[in-house]
């Protein structure tokens, strides 16, 4: 994570992320990551907890690659091309506490929601739905001051499933 902090310090106004019409500088992008870390901690996510993501390559998905591990949680990117039964298996097998989904996959997750044993929170990465946390609203209402924790180089960072 130090390389990201260094980039923010040295190049805060340099463009870092382009997602369609959205553009973020290093400072903007990493502040969003920090806000998401803070929001996750407020949801009770801590060291070793799994956060599953079902999304194509978007800025919010990229933010997860910084926000989740910097609080010691484990990122579980799920191949969005899979079927709902596969989503169910992966989410349950990894023990996800939070599921974050792009709007294209919310209906699929809602269809298996009752079978997702340990999931405590569902986050809509764009917009919101019934019983879904609005990602952008969570960023807007949280400080970038997350609680920093000690992370060892042997700590689990991500769980990747192959198809």
Predicted segments, located by residue:
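ANL superfamily adenylate-forming
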Residues: 106-154
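A short N-terminal helical cap/helix-turn-helix that marks the beginning
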Residues: 1-16
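Conserved adenylation A10 loop of the ANL superfamily
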Residues: 12, 159-163
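Short hydrophobic alpha-helices that are characteristic scaffold elements of the AMP-binding
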Residues: 66-71, 93
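Conserved AMP-binding/adenylate-forming core of the ANL superfamily
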Residues: 13-58, 62-66, 83-88, 134-140
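Conserved ATP-dependent adenylate/AMP-binding module captured primarily in the ANL superfamily
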Residues: 82-111, 141
């Amino acid at each position: 994570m130090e390389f990201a902090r260094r980039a923010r310090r040295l190049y805060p106004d340099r463009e870092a992320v382009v997602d369609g019409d959205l553009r973020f500088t290093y400072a903007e992008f990493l502040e969003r990551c920090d806000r998401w870390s803070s929001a996750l901690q407020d949801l009770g996510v801590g060291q070793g907890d799994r956060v599953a993501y079902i999304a194509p390559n978007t800025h919010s998905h990229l933010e997860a690659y910084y926000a989740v591990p910097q609080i010691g949680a484990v990122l579980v990117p799920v191949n969005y091309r899979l079927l709902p039964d596969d989503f169910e298996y992966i989410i349950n097998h990894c023990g996800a506490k939070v599921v974050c989904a792009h709007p294209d996959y919310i209906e699929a997750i809602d269809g298996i929601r009752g079978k997702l044993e340990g999931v405590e929170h569902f986050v809509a990465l764009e917009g919101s739905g019934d019983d879904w946390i609005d990602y952008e609203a969570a960023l807007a209402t949280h400080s970038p001051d997350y609680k920093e924790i000690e992370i060892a180089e042997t700590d689990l960072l991500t769980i990747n499933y192959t198809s």
